Each structure stands twice: as C-alpha cells, then as structure tokens.
Regions:
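Short helices/loops that flank or line small-molecule/ion binding pockets
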Residues: 56, 64, 69-82, 96, ...
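A ligand-binding cleft/hinge motif common to bilobed small-molecule-binding domains
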Residues: 87-95, 140, 164-165, 169-197
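Short loop->beta-strand "edge-of-pocket" segments that line small-molecule binding or catalytic clefts
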Residues: 23-27, 121-134
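Flexible hinge/capping segments at coil-to-helix
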Residues: 101, 112-129
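Extracytoplasmic small-molecule ligand-binding "clamshell" domains
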Residues: 20-86
Length: 237
C-alpha cells in the first residue's frame, strides 16, 4: 500500500476527527519543480521531503492541493499538519505559523517576453507586473514599491498567459519555477539579476513543537546527506 495518498480536491477537510495515522500536507501544485502534477500524481522536491517526514512518523502522507493564499489558514485551523509549497519565510508569516529550519534558498526573478523593451530587473518598478496572490513578491511590491501596478493571480499559468497576451509587462516569481516556465515557453526569457533573495521553510501550526522538532530532524538529515540537492536535480532535468 502506498505511503501517500493524493487528494485532487479544492475543498476543505474538517479538522476534527482526523485519522491520526495520516499526515496531511497542504500545497499548491502548480510550482514545478517543487510541486506539480505528473500523470495525475503530485510530484516534486517538496513531495519527496514530505514523504520522508511521513515515513519518520510512520504515517500515510495525504496531499491537499489548494490555492496558495489559503495555505497558512489551513495550518492555523488545524486542517493540515504541514505546508510545503515553496513558502518563503518572513516576519509577517511567522506571526501566523511556526516554521522549520530553512531548506532552500531562492531568488525572485523577472520573466519578460523576449522582444520586451525591459532589459534590466531595475526597470520593472514602474511597470505592470504579475505576481501570485499572497506571495512574497506580492508583499514586497505592495509594501516597498507602490508605483508598481500589480496584477495578482492565484495560478502561475494564468500569469504566463497574461504576459504572452501583453496584459502585463513582466512576471516576478521564484527562480527555479521561472526556469521551468521558460523551458516550456520559448518566447519568454528571464532577465539577468534578481529582485531579492528568500528562503523556504515548512509551515506548522503554532505551538506544535513535537511535530516541528521531528520535521527539523528530518530536514537536517536530508540536508546533511545531500538529498535535497538530489531532489532538485531530479526534478529539473
């Protein structure tokens, strides 16, 4: 029997009466190479990590695919145990949930059309920029660059269509998923440089120190053994 079960639903699971033998991971599976669909299953770097966490707890992994801006609420309400979705750690999010140790360092990069007149990342601030709703890019521009006209979307694929349709001038998003998008869309390119760096952590309900300690133990082992780098290589081939 598989140690993980994928629920391809966008509905809420009730927090009460949950099976104690299941570890519920919440994610947004449109973020390759970290989590995405392949032949009907959700796969990726974060999924591999979650499998190891579930294995260490002797539990069955259940993966819940929802919109990114709802993920932390699922953790806060107890409807999910862990959240892995390329979640950048910042002070605002730390007020809502606890985070594991950092396990990935990322950069926020800029995608444009190849024939765009935007040639430098510093040129995007007075442009029309697509960001994922609730992402650190959303927060960054909202707080620090109010002159930027933001188009907030729930899905990266929608942002790509907006860019290709000239509805926005650029997309700002995480580097590895941006590279995956550009691989599949040859009329797009990533500008040299980046907007800012960020780090990913696993979100857990505040006060659940037992689970947090176990997650950190697993992450430390994976990092020290070079496994996370192996997962990244595996899913970016």
């Amino acid at each position: 029997m598989k140690k993980y079960l994928i629920l391809l639903v966008l509905v809420l699971l009730t927090g009460c009466g949950r099976d104690k033998n299941k570890l519920i991971m919440v994610t947004e599976a449109g973020f390759a190479p970290y989590e995405y669909y392949e032949d009907g299953d959700i796969v990726g770097v974060d999924v591999e990590i979650a499998k190891e966490i579930a294995k260490s707890l002797d539990k069955e992994l259940v993966i819940k695919d929802i919109y990114f801006d709802s993920i932390l609420n699922e953790i806060k309400s107890g409807k999910a145990d862990i959240a892995l979705a390329g979640i950048s750690v910042n002070e605002e999010r730390k007020k809502e949930v606890d985070f594991s140790i950092n396990y990935i360092t990322s950069r926020q990069v800029v995608i444009v059309l190849k024939d765009s007149n935007i040639t430098d990342v510093d040129n995007v601030y007075n442009k029309k920029v697509a960001v994922q709703l609730g992402s650190v890019a959303d927060t960054y521009f909202t707080d620090k660059h109010k002159s930027t006209e933001l188009v907030r979307q729930k899905k990266y694929l929608t942002m790509v269509e907006d860019l290709k349709g000239n509805k926005v001038d650029a997309i700002v998003m995480d580097e590895l998923p941006a590279k995956e998008i550009v691989k599949k869309n040859t009329n797009l390119t990533i500008l040299d440089g980046y907007i800012f760096e960020d780090t990913y952590g696993i979100a857990i309900k505040k006060g659940n120190t037992e689970l947090l300690d176990k997650v950190n133990e697993v992450l430390n082992n994976l990092i020290n053994d070079g496994k996370i780098n192996e997962y990244v290589i595996k899913y970016t081939k």
